[in-house]
């Protein structure tokens, strides 16, 4: 039996940014804090027949990619924040790891190999997170209020005085937020503050379990005036979110290259990283290459993040989204940006899309697909079922933006092997630096095979089935 104090050679990182090594007997060891190429010892916390898990305890050979973390709350120490997992790895190396995760998932789960790799999309590693959900905890025994992310592998809130992945103004505001909550009458009934920042406005959504007193409302107003933030309140579910006081500037972000401004509410889905979102939108539009005479369908369109820029280039864009509320907001955004004439929107459950429904709603020259983590299985499956059907012409190109490499790989397998498309390109988007989250973009082009039925008896590779498994490390 191997000793927990054996020196191990770290081979790779898994999806949780843990180092992966093997003992002499072949057992896999997952090591938090270790990097590929390092020789380490591990303090084992869990043991199973085939694997072990633990924390880096000693380091004999250090990776050249190891860097000093940029936040004092990051690390393996007790009480460390669990919001980031990769601050000890050079940002360029983080991108390389995510690219490998994408390629491995496409191949192992979808049996798909892109014809070329896209240049990774990346940007500033700090101050990028314009959306965040911060937990709040009043600790009576210590007489303090904690505001921040949870501790690593814990339900407790980390004792944070700064957070460099948040906008600098918000990071610097954390101590003042703690003081504010500590002074409020309802301090033990305020579990969460959600950040939603736009180009000009920083909105904070306060979740409160009891009605706020007049005194507490006055404290919020004074804080907002001093720190330049807009308060929203959430007494119950997301549908109850409302402004503390009406008036003032509107929460919005812009896509300057396309002359688009997108008003939104704090509860609406918007990308965490606005700088990367601008680059991503431009990359997606250029890859889709809509022509002035073409019709585009934007699946999972949300507020119109891709719909409206595409409408600047194409004859018509039809956005489809599961939420009627978001569809209405997308219509309003299209009208506000002068794009109502060549955009249309519809609410539809895209997780139950049948081939017949796709036949009537999916006819277009090109598709933009931007699903949530669950992916677009029903859409990809129906596309495959329509292959060769009389009266159906599949889109010439599909650009698929993904926030889960496992479901992208599953759907890519259907699109390539059963629907008859080629995966001509794929690449990563580092939307969340210092985390293990992998965002990506893939491009599929219609081949001649997509226009004819799949040959009877043609063998298909064994593909990942619905629901998708966890991503491959």
From Swiss-Prot:
It catalyses: uridine(1939) in 23S rRNA + S-adenosyl-L-methionine = 5-methyluridine(1939) in 23S rRNA + S-adenosyl-L-homocysteine + H(+). It comes from the Bacteria. Belongs to the class I-like SAM-binding methyltransferase superfamily. RNA M5U methyltransferase family. RlmD subfamily. This is 23S rRNA (uracil(1939)-C(5))-methyltransferase RlmD. InterPro entries: 23S_rRNA_MeTrfase_RlmD (IPR001566), MeTrfase_TrmA_CS (IPR030391), NA-bd_OB-fold (IPR012340), SAM-dependent_MTases_sf (IPR029063), TRAM_dom (IPR002792), U5_MeTrfase_fam (IPR010280). [4Fe-4S] cluster binds at residues 71, 81, 84, 163. GO terms for molecular function: 4 iron, 4 sulfur cluster binding; iron ion binding; RNA binding; rRNA (uridine-C5-)-methyltransferase activity. Pfam families: TRAM (PF01938), tRNA_U5-meth_tr (PF05958). GO terms for biological process: rRNA base methylation. S-adenosyl-L-methionine binds at residues 271, 300, 305, 321, 349, 370. The active site is at 403 (nucleophile). Catalyzes the formation of 5-methyl-uridine at position 1939 (m5U1939) in 23S rRNA. Its EC number is 2.1.1.190. Residues 1-58 form the TRAM domain. It comes from Rubrivivax gelatinosus (strain NBRC 100245 / IL144). NCBIfam families: PRK13168.1. Keywords: 4Fe-4S, Iron, Iron-sulfur, Metal-binding, Methyltransferase, rRNA processing, S-adenosyl-L-methionine, Transferase. HAMAP family: 23SrRNA_methyltr_RlmD (MF_01010). The gene is rlmD. It is an enzyme of class 2 (transferase).
